[in-house]
Amino acid sequence: MKFDILTLFPAMFDGPLTESIIRRAVERGFVDISLHNIRDYATDRHRVVDDAPYGGGDGMVMKVEPLAACIEAVKAERPAARVILTTPRGRRFDHDAARELAGYEELIIVCGRYEGIDERVRDLFVDDEFSIGDFVLTGGELAAMVMIDAVIRFIPGVLGSPGSAEYDSFADGLLEYPQYTRPVEFRGVQVPGVLLSGNHAEISRWRRQKALELTRRVRPDLLHKAELSSSDRDCLAMLEREGEP
């Protein structure tokens, strides 16, 4: 999968895109990531990429010409690439959105800055817009990093275990169950006995119940769209009767 990131601050991506799973994905040829400095496409001697907004107001707006030139240069090499803009105005980026974007072979991610971009960039070039939450960041670079990390997890072969992405939190609409590893006891706190039993059916049942409990307590809104079986609903009803928080 090919990612082209359009940004005013390419150095911000050192580290997040050069370590851990993303680094291994690049080294193994599953992912190709290129950074493009929008400022390189400014045509004036001072390489200006922003200007005051028409109509007045605070802050500056990213100019259309450098952005257009940068997008067109990348699209000339990858005409089928989907152009994504990171912006608070976008639709919510979540587990399903990450899976959706993983279905594309080429993505161009435009990182917004300042008070936003000239609207004509949206009108002429952008295919989709995403926001990672109801808050404002200094720029779209951090959002782009989050999105790339989440999308890459769905690329076959990237994760060590083929089922890892499918068992993550949100994969089936629920938060993930609690995880434990050695030692069995730490400062008086024991690993639940069922996880040591070797009974895979009981372990699966325990994990599902804990996922339901956690989701009900922390993110009850997720239950409205989760894929719940009749036994899941029975478990939730039992928790309600027992007054579990």
UniProtKB/Swiss-Prot annotation:
It is found in: Cytoplasm. Signal peptide: none annotated. It catalyses: guanosine(37) in tRNA + S-adenosyl-L-methionine = N(1)-methylguanosine(37) in tRNA + S-adenosyl-L-homocysteine + H(+). GO terms for molecular function: tRNA (guanine(37)-N1)-methyltransferase activity. InterPro entries: Alpha/beta_knot_MTases, tRNA_m1G_MeTrfase_C_sf, tRNA_m1G_MeTrfase_TrmD, tRNA_m1G_MTases_N, tRNA_MeTrfase_TRMD/TRM10. Its EC number is 2.1.1.228. GO terms for biological process: tRNA N1-guanine methylation. Gene3D superfamilies: 3.40.1280.10, tRNA(m1g37)methyltransferase, domain 2. Keywords: Cytoplasm, Methyltransferase, S-adenosyl-L-methionine, Transferase, tRNA processing. Homodimer. HAMAP family: TrmD (MF_00605). Belongs to the RNA methyltransferase TrmD family. Specifically methylates guanosine-37 in various tRNAs. This is tRNA (guanine-N(1)-)-methyltransferase. It comes from Geobacter sulfurreducens (strain ATCC 51573 / DSM 12127 / PCA). The gene is trmD.
